[in-house]
């Protein structure tokens, strides 16, 4: 896979003023492969299963605590 290059060039001359914009972006395959390796390591195999279980448990406790606090303040006796 070859790196993709994109460029934007804008130039305008009006009333003696000069505006110019020039942008260039290059996406490297090295960064993409690094991200892909990290995602494959964290999302597959035993480590991936452990990450999903830990994420599910953390999400459960966050929702549980938010529900508890909401119920406490909604049903609080005055």
Curated annotation (Swiss-Prot):
GO cellular component: cell surface; plasma membrane
Spans within the Extracellular topological domain: 68-78
Expression across tissues: Highly expressed in the bone marrow and expressed at lower levels in non-hematopoietic tissues. Highly expressed in erythroleukemia cell lines. Up-regulated in CD34+ hematopoietic progenitors cultured toward red blood cells.
Predominant cellular place of this UniProt entry's protein: membrane
Annotated spans, Displays the Vel antigen: 68-78
Ranges annotated as biased composition (Basic and acidic residues): 1-18
Cytoplasmic compartment residues: 1-46
Alphabetical keyword list: Acetylation, Blood group antigen, Cell membrane, Disulfide bond, Membrane, Phosphoprotein, Signal-anchor, Transmembrane, Transmembrane helix
Phosphoserine sites (modified residues): 6, 17, 22, 27
Effect of residue 51 to K: Found in Vel-negative population; uncertain significance; heterozygous with the 17-nucleotide frameshift deletion
Outcome of swapping residue 35 to S: No effect on cell surface expression of the Vel antigen
Subcellular location: Cell membrane
Region (Disordered): 1-20
Pfam families linked: DUF4731 (PF15875)
Domain of life of the source: Eukaryota
Positions carrying N-acetylmethionine: 1
Residues passing through the membrane, by range: 47-67
Membrane topology: Single-pass type II membrane protein
Reported effect, residue 22 to A: No effect on cell membrane localization. No effect on cell surface expression of the Vel antigen
Annotated effect of mutating residue 43 to S: No effect on cell surface expression of the Vel antigen
UniProt effect for mutating residue 51 to R: Found in Vel-negative population; uncertain significance; heterozygous with the 17-nucleotide frameshift deletion
GO MF assignments: protein homodimerization activity
Domain notes: The extracellular domain carries the Vel antigen.
Function, in words: Regulator of red blood cell formation.
UniProt subunit comment: Homooligomer; disulfide-linked.
The protein's name in its UniProt record: Small integral membrane protein 1
């Amino acid at each position: 896979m070859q790196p993709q290059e994109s460029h934007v060039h804008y130039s305008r001359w009006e009333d003696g003023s000069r505006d110019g914009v020039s942008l260039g972006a290059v996406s490297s395959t090295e960064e993409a492969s690094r991200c892909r390796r990290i995602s494959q390591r964290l999302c597959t195999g035993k480590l991936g299963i452990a990450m999903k279980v830990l994420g599910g448990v953390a999400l459960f406790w966050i929702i549980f605590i938010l529900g508890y606090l909401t119920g406490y303040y909604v049903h609080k006796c005055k």
